[in-house]
């Protein structure tokens, strides 16, 4: 049946929604704050510039792009009119393909992408065809029609308006939780609640996995002595950071839902897995100083894990666009690992106010200046670590662009050999 569907946000996700639903014969109305974005979308029957248009009449369904906050006025208006509000995730989970093939959902404050990619790699290594999709940058609706296990990264942005129970996932994991995205969610409770809504996507009697310290009803912890013993036997493994162990444990638990995972297959997958860039990515050294790109660390918790992984004699570059991070909480781990903090970008003064009395700290207007300062301070044996603990949007389009620029700066000063 043809429906009048309002697509809120016409970026990457909105475009994929329009492509998919146009093939289903629906009447599609796109809405965005950017006229340029609206014009760039094919398959729309009508286009509305939010802020200059009224909420349209006779809408059957609203599909919210992740960038549209769950309390956006048009979302709230739809809710008041009892119009269902969903995201591309809920649209995809209702397709026959998510009943035909096993599928897994992965959420958490940190480690989602690494776990998604590793689980996909693990299954393929075991001879089980699998494809990664979702918040990983591969819109879920663009992968309809491909056979194989679905491994879906799902963000709190995509879950925040999940109301209906859609029994599609063969298993799901909530990797961890830390203070984050308070520039998006109304408060920490709303952020946590959004993450928990992944349970609404589980098939009946399927497993909901959580991190070791978490205690939630109807859930199982991803850590097990069995996995620890397997990892300890992997003598030929490259060093595994503690947080990556959690990611591997989660993938192991989920993979067991579709068949027994042999220790040999698990260890082979770890040996052959290439972690995505910008996650404790070692860039090399010059004059005995090591350089590490951890641009993906956009939360205080991620910075803590990075510092614990690197260990000591760290010169850490923090800063960017604040997401409500608890910077005073870094004081303890900084005192154990760090020689100097360089606070850069939009929230550099916020970081300085929180930490300057506890550890040597220098302010920097941008990443280029921060690298120059770090090069001046660093001595043989030190590690310069970009682990911002903030979003990148004060000066960059994404953490990837920020990380790529950091790598360029390091190459230009011939730090890598």
Swiss-Prot record:
Q: Does the keyword Nucleotide-binding apply?
A: yes
* Gene this chain is encoded by: murD
- Which named protein is this? UDP-N-acetylmuramoylalanine--D-glutamate ligase
- UniProt family annotation: Belongs to the MurCDEF family.
Superkingdom, taxonomy of origin: Bacteria
Protein localization: Cytoplasm
Q: To which species is this protein native?
A: Chlamydia pneumoniae
The record lists the catalysed reaction(s) as:
UDP-N-acetyl-alpha-D-muramoyl-L-alanine + D-glutamate + ATP = UDP-N-acetyl-alpha-D-muramoyl-L-alanyl-D-glutamate + ADP + phosphate + H(+)
Q: What GO molecular function annotations does the UniProt record carry, in alphabetical order?
A: ATP binding; UDP-N-acetylmuramoylalanine-D-glutamate ligase activity
Which residues of this UniProt protein bind ATP? Answer: 108-114
């Amino acid at each position: 049946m043809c429906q009048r569907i309002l697509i809120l946000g016409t970026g990457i996700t909105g475009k994929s929604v329009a492509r998919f639903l146009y093939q289903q014969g629906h009447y599609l109305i796109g809405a965005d704050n950017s006229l340029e974005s609206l014009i760039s979308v094919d398959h729309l029957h009508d286009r509305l510039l939010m802020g200059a248009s009224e909420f349209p009449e006779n809408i059957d369904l609203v599909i919210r792009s992740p960038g549209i906050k769950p309390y956006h006025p048009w979302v709230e208006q739809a809710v008041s009119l009892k119009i269902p509000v969903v995201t591309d995730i809920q649209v995809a989970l209702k397709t026959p393909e998510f009943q035909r093939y096993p599928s897994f959902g992965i959420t958490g404050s940190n480690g989602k992408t690494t776990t998604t990619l590793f689980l996909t790699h693990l299954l393929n290594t075991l001879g089980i065809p699998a494809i990664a999709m979702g918040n990983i940058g591969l819109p879920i609706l663009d992968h309809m029609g491909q056979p194989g296990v679905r491994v879906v990264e799902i963000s709190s942005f995509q879950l925040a308006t999940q109301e209906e129970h859609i029994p599609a996932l063969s298993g799901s994991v909530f990797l961890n939780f830390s203070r984050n995205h308070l520039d998006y969610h109304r408060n920490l409770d709303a952020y946590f609640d959004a993450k928990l809504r992944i349970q609404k996507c589980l098939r009946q009697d399927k497993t909901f996995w959580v991190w070791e310290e978490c205690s939630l009803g109807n859930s199982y912890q991803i850590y097990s002595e069995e996995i620890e013993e397997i990892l300890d036997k992997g003598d030929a493994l490259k060093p595994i950071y503690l947080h990556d162990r959690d990611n591997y444990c989660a993938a192991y638990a989920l993979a067991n839902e579709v068949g027994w995972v042999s220790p040999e297959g698990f260890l082979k997958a770890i040996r052959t897995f290439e972690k995505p860039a910008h996650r404790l990515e070692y860039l090399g050294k010059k004059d005995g100083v090591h350089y590490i790109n951890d641009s993906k660390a956009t939360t205080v918790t991620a910075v803590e894990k990075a510092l614990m992984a690197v260990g000591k004699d760290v010169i850490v570059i923090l800063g960017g666009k604040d997401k409500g991070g608890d910077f005073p909480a870094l004081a303890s781990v900084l005192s154990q690992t760090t020689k100097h903090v360089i606070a850069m970008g939009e929230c550099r003064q916020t970081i300085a106010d929180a930490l300057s009395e506890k550890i040597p700290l220098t302010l920097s207007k941008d990443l280029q200046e921060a690298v120059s300062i770090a090069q001046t301070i660093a001595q043989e044996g030190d590690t310069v670590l970009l682990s911002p603990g903030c979003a990148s949007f004060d000066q960059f389009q994404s953490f990837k662009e920020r990380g790529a620029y950091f790598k360029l700066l390091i190459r230009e000063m011939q730090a890598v050999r």
